[in-house]
């Protein structure tokens, strides 16, 4: 099967839900663009937990305004089912009994239909032969530990011609033995009287269910069963899924008796089925309930449907009509008002029979509980469904809520639920596990959150068997049966183990993660943020201080600058403030309050020719400014030399045209480039990453596995050459550290009950991480497990790939060329084994991925599984020793432009697991770099800032974690002892941040002082002037002389 790929995550996210073609075909055809989309969408809708009134079902399509994308209980609820919850499993007689004409059994309409309509199927004798191997069925029931077993009685096995006269003794003995064995095991029997195997004689004589004579005959048959088995049976089902009996048996012709084209016959059959059920219920209620104390119902099946637009009333109306025409057709007369739904009566008045008032009264309330079937038979074939242009969905929880609102919150038994796998799947039915998990999760949420009264659940089915129109091309059993074997051994599938665990625990226990801890990271912990490639500004943004020429504007009236020749002005030296882009970077970093900033250089910009013949000094000056200006804010840089995000990004064009990383000379060119960067920036940079995610870059060279492995080899050599160069020439003076960062998602077996999946998960880690880690951290050579696995496929003719053979010199070159371990971790992958042929890297691994739709995930399908990062850190320590580890990129995409709650949830949970690794597991974790600073337009939203630099609320959350150094106890101090240098840097930080304001303030203050000084000076001068002038006008007294 060809995998599908969803791009947009830090690594391509492969999405798998199934391993067989039939499942994939149904998934892809359902729901106008894919059932998978509907399943994932429906898992994100929380239903309103309201007490409904009859007929209020359409309210279910209104979305809850209180829904939050990070409330995990709204996606998957870790909780238990109510005490004494009824756990069961079911089968149908025709599907598993076999022996279709043995011991006096009469033929059924399906026995005839198989011979006349189904190609390549001769009979049901190839089924599980439960009629012969009853003890093996009982052992299977014991293995799972169910509370009840739902099975059907074969009407023609008891009465070969359908008429209740003398019962077939062998048939009677078989069912009596089965019931006795169940009672002995404390397993409650739930017995279905009619599961589609009408005696052929009744079809030929009366026309089957089209003739209302069958009603009385069915009642006689039911009466006999009540008499013979009622002392041991407390739960009865009259008819299993009458909709399919009528619609496919008499409408599409897909089921026996194979009639089609007569719509009036379809609704006549449905009418008679309802009346037959009602008659049997009244019979039991009057004559048997008083002393047998049992309950009786009819199993009704349905699909579920979602509106194209939840806000569109017409789409909601169509969804309501779709449900009414299938489930309401039978539920409304029995569980509702005794009549068909009003919409059906108006639309189908010419073909829909009419209930008299007395019949309505008789129909109403003829079920002691609501028995509900929700499985693949209700969803296929799609062209026969009443979709009404809307989207089919597998949301069982919504269907249960609809029943609650339409029929006044009845007690509900899930009488059939499950999915199917391809007939080639044997015991490793991984898809079935996840479908069961999804369905059971929805039932649990319906009980706990929506207060729906579900009291039991029937997994379908116990055994592989005959699957109606699909015959033996699909399997639905929890136990695998080889139909061609003589002994028909029942082998438990993975789904049987899973269901057994669910029953034992009575629900879902949270085993994967431990409780949150309180504690702090060390004071020297690196709190960082990651950015991808920073494109340098080619020219300074502010050239006015560096251009020595004088210009005159509009000298000729053309509104242009004209240079004045012969005049040169004095310029100032170049400054980092010349680059406007850097200022924006610094503003964002200052708001992040991180201690470290990881960014990548653009190799192609620094060395356009790929060698040292043409060095772009302007680009180097730009990068030096980024680092130096960051240091002024107290933010250190972790610089990545090469950060490709696709095949050619960042690789100089001449190297790209020379086959890129397939050419060994590229490694030498990288060494020269690295040496230049160490020389120009190394005095300021203490943490270096040579290559970002070489284990993903090499995947791009995928014409063959040998291309992939060759590119990886050259990438390893390039890193080692750069590390050796730094160690030899620059480390003594610069005292930095160099490593490379690996994409390092964790892997879990998709099927924990399959050894092959456990091996596949470890193989994923070997091919993904150990592929590069083993040569550098440990042996100098590729992992032995990886080499042997590829060689074994080569020997079997499945692949022509081979890992390169390293020389002794190359092993010495590679070994130990890391100063720390740098990991980019985003999610956990669920891995399954699938043997693949072909000589490519993906095929060599024999791995496929499965997405668990019950888990919280991002828009790009990145699953939020926090405990995976802790497992990864422990795995690295266990395999490569106690070394310093930096998580150099970790994050999630979140569609929110402001309140990015998913990102806050992700950060909090993942940092909790990292803290556990530090405090409990003693992993030497040295830093965490959140991915990423700013998002890019038209790409998944991983950024703390939008593409137009608007801050999101996750910044404040990350700030708080950083300032607290984790998750401290109450009243504990988060302060670290600071040196004088740190204090001074704090002052520097304030000055740099407020530099424009301070400058403006100084100018304003100086101007104000100058104006005040002038004003005071002028005032004093005026006072002196007027004083002198006034003295001149003072008169002398007569007779007085002034004697000197």
From Swiss-Prot:
GO CC terms of this entry: plasma membrane
Membrane-crossing residue ranges in chain numbering: 997-1017
Chain segments carrying region Glycosyl hydrolase-1 2: 517-967
Lipid bilayer topology: Single-pass type III membrane protein
Keywords, sorted A to Z: Cell membrane, Glycoprotein, Membrane, Repeat, Transmembrane, Transmembrane helix
Protein location: Cell membrane
GO molecular function: fibroblast growth factor binding; fibroblast growth factor receptor binding; hydrolase activity, hydrolyzing O-glycosyl compounds
Residue ranges that the UniProt entry lists as topological domain Cytoplasmic: 1018-1044
Residue segments, region Glycosyl hydrolase-1 1: 77-508
One Pfam family recorded for the sequence: Glyco_hydro_1
Extracellular compartment segments: 1-996
Chief site of localization: membrane
Superkingdom field: Eukaryota
Residues bearing carbohydrate: 71, 120, 125, 211, 308, 391, 554, 611, 702, 706, 971
An annotated GO BP: carbohydrate metabolic process
Family membership: Belongs to the glycosyl hydrolase 1 family. Klotho subfamily.
Assembly information from the UniProt record: Interacts with FGFR1 and FGFR4. Interacts with FGF19; this interaction is direct. Interacts (via C-terminus) with FGF21; this interaction is direct.
Notes on the domains: Contains 2 glycosyl hydrolase 1 regions. However, the first region lacks the essential Glu active site residue at position 241, and the second one lacks the essential Glu active site residue at position 889. These domains are therefore predicted to be inactive.
UniProt function note: Contributes to the transcriptional repression of cholesterol 7-alpha-hydroxylase (CYP7A1), the rate-limiting enzyme in bile acid synthesis. Probably inactive as a glycosidase. Increases the ability of FGFR1 and FGFR4 to bind FGF21.
Protein name, as recorded: Beta-klotho
């Amino acid at each position: 099967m060809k995998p599908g790929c969803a791009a947009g995550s830090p690594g391509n996210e492969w999405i798998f839900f199934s391993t067989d073609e039939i499942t994939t075909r149904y998934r892809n055809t359902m729901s106008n663009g894919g059932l998978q989309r509907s399943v994932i969408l429906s898992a994100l809708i929380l239903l309103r937990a309201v007490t409904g009134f009859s007929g209020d079902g359409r309210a279910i399509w209104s979305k809850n305004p209180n829904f939050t994308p990070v409330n995990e209980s709204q996606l998957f609820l870790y909780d238990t089912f109510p005490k004494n919850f009824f756990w069961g499993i079911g089968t149908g007689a025709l599907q598993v009994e076999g022996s279709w004409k043995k011991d006096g059994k009469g033929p059924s309409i399906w026995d005839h239909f198989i011979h006349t309509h189904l190609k390549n199927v001769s009979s049901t004798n190839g089924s599980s032969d439960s009629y012969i191997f009853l003890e093996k069925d009982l052992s299977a029931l014991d293995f799972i530990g169910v509370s009840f077993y739902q099975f059907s009685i074969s009407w023609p096995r008891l009465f070969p011609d359908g008429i209740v006269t003398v019962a077939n003794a062998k048939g009677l003995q078989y069912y009596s033995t089965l019931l006795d064995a169940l009672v002995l095991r404390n397993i409650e029997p739930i017995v279905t009287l009619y599961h589609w195997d009408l005696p052929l004689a009744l079809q030929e004589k009366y026309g089957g269910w089209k003739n209302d004579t069958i009603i009385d005959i069915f009642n006689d048959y039911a009466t006999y069963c009540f008499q013979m088995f009622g002392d041991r049976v407390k739960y009865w089902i009259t008819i299993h899924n009458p909709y399919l009996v009528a619609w496919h048996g008499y409408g599409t012709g897909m089921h026996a008796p194979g009639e089609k084209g007569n719509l009036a016959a379809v609704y006549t059959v449905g009418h008679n089925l309802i009346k037959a059920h009602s008659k049997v219920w009244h019979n039991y209620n009057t004559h048997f309930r008083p002393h047998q104390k049992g309950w009786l119902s009819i199993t009704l099946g349905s699909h579920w449907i979602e509106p194209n637009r939840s806000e569109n009333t017409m789409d909601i109306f169509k969804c309501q009509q779709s449900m009414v025409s299938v489930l309401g057709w039978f539920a409304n007369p029995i569980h509702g008002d005794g009549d068909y739904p009003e919409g059906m009566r108006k639309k189908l008045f010419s073909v829909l029979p009419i209930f008299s008032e007395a019949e309505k009264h008789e129909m109403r309330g003829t079920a002691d509980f609501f028995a509900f079937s929700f499985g693949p038979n209700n969803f296929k074939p799609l062209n026969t469904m009443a979709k009404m242009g809307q989207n089919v969905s597998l949301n069982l929880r919504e269907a249960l809520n609809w029943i609650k609102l339409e029929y006044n919150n009845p007690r509900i038994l899930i009488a059939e639920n499950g999915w199917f796998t391809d007939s080639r799947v044997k015991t490793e039915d991984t898809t079935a596990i996840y479908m069961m998990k999804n369905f059971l999760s929805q039932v649990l949420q319906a009980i706990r959150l929506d207060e729906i009264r579900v009291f039991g659940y029937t997994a379908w089915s116990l055994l592989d068997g005959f699957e109606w129109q699909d015959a033996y091309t699909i399997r639905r059993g929890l136990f695998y049966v080889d139909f061609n074997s003589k002994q028909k051994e029942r082998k438990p599938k993975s789904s049987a183990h899973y269901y057994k665990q669910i029953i034992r625990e009575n629900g879902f226990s949270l085993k994967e993660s431990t409780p949150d801890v309180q504690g702090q990271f060390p004071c020297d912990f690196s709190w960082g943020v990651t950015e991808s490639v920073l494109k340098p500004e080619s020219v300074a943004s502010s050239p006015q201080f560096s251009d020595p020429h004088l210009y005159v504007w509009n000298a000729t009236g053309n509104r242009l600058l004209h240079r004045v020749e012969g005049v040169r002005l004095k310029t100032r030296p170049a400054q980092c403030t010349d680059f406007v882009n850097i200022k924006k970077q610094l503003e964002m970093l200052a708001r992040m309050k991180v201690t470290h900033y990881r960014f990548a250089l653009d190799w192609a910009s620094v060395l356009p020719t790929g060698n040292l013949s043409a060095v772009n000094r302007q680009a180097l000056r730009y990068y030096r400014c980024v680092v130096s200006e960051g240091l002024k804010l107290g933010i250190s840089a972790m610089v990545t030399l090469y950060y490709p995000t696709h095949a050619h990004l960042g690789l100089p064009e001449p190297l790209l045209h020379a086959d890129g990383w397939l050419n060994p000379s590229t490694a030498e060119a990288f060494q020269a480039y690295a040496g230049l960067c160490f020389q120009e920036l190394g005095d300021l940079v203490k943490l270096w990453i040579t290559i970002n995610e070489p284990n993903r870059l090499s995947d791009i060279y995928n014409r063959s596995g040998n291309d992939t492995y060759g590119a990886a080899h050259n990438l390893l050599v390039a890193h080692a050459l750069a590390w050796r160069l730094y160690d030899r020439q620059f480390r003594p003076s610069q005292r930095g550290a160099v490593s490379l960062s690996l994409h390092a998602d964790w892997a879990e077996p998709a099927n924990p009950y399959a050894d092959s999946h456990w091996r596949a998960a470890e193989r994923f880690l070997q091919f993904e991480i150990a592929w590069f880690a083993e040569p550098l951290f440990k042996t100098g050579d590729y992992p032995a497990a990886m080499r042997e696995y590829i060689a074994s496929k080569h020997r079997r003719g499945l692949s022509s790939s081979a890992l390169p053979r390293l020389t002794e010199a190359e092993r010495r070159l590679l070994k130990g060329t890391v100063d720390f371990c740098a990991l980019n971790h985003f999610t956990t992958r669920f891995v399954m084994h699938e043997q693949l042929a072909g000589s490519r890297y993906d095929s060599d691994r024999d791995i496929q991925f499965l997405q668990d739709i019950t888990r919280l995930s991002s828009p790009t399908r990145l699953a939020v599984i926090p405990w995976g990062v802790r497992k990864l850190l422990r795995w690295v320590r266990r395999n490569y020793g106690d070394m310093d580890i930096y998580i150099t990129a970790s994050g999630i995409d979140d569609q929110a432009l402001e309140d990015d709650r998913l990102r806050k949830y992700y950060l909090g949970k993942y940092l909790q697991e990292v803290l556990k690794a530090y405090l409990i597991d003693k992993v030497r974790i040295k830093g965490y770099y959140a991915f990423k600073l700013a998002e890019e337009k038209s790409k998944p939203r991983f950024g703390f800032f939008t593409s137009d630099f608007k801050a999101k609320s996750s910044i404040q959350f990350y700030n708080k974690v950083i300032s607290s150094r984790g998750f401290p106890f109450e009243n504990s101090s988060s302060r670290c002892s600071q040196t004088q240098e740190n204090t001074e840097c704090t002052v520097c930080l304030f000055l740099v941040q407020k530099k424009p304001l301070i400058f403006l303030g100084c100018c304003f203050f100086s101007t104000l002082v100058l104006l005040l000084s002038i004003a005071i000076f002028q005032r004093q001068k005026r006072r002196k002037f007027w004083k002198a002038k006034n003295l001149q006008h003072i008169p002398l007294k007569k007779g007085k002389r002034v004697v000197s």
